[in-house]
C-alpha cells in the first residue's frame, strides 16, 4: 500500500475542511483505494458526518494519543467499502493541555500511524481549526498538507500563520512535509468576487491550486446531518461529482 498521509488543515473555521476530509476520503475509497480518515478535531464532525454514534465509541484518537491504545483497536468501519475511521469524541478537547508536559508530544500521532499506515493507500487527517499541538501532531505525521480556501473576500487572511507553522514543522519536525495542494471551496458562481479570489489564490500558490473547485451546493451541506458522505447521500449531485474529480486529481488519474 502507498501509505500516504495527508492532513487537511486551515486554522480558519468554516472553509470546508471537514467536508473536504470526509468527501475526499469517501471518493478515494470509491475509486478502489483503501482509506483511513483520522478525526483529530475535538468537535468530531468527521466522525458524526460518517454516521458514527460517538456514544458507541469505545476508543477514539484521544486514547491513541494519551493512553497509548493501539490505533488498530481504535479503528472503526464506515458504511463505505474501503473507508475506515479513527473517531474523535469530546474527550479530545482536553488533549491539548494533557500533551503539554508529555515527552516528544509533537510526534505522538506520527508514531501511532507508523503502526498502521501501510495497510492503507491514503490516510486523511481532519484537523481542528487552530494551530495548536493537535495540528502540529498532524503535520508532523504527514507526507503533505491539503489547504482548503473559501472563495471569499478575506480568503488569504490568516494563511500566513498556517504557512509559517508548516515551515516551522518542516524545519524542526518533518523536513519531508510538502503542500499537497490548495483547494478552492464554496464558490458562488453568481459573483465576480469568486473569480477575483480564484485569480488571487492562483497568483500566490500557482501550480499547487487544484483544477477542481468546490461550489456551494445544498446537497453537500445537507449530507453530514444524515451521517453520510455526499457519494452515499446523493451520488448524482454536483457535490459528488466535484469531490470525485478532486479524488482523481489526488490519485493522478
Where in this protein do the model-derived segments appear?
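P-loop NTP-binding core
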Residues: 1-253
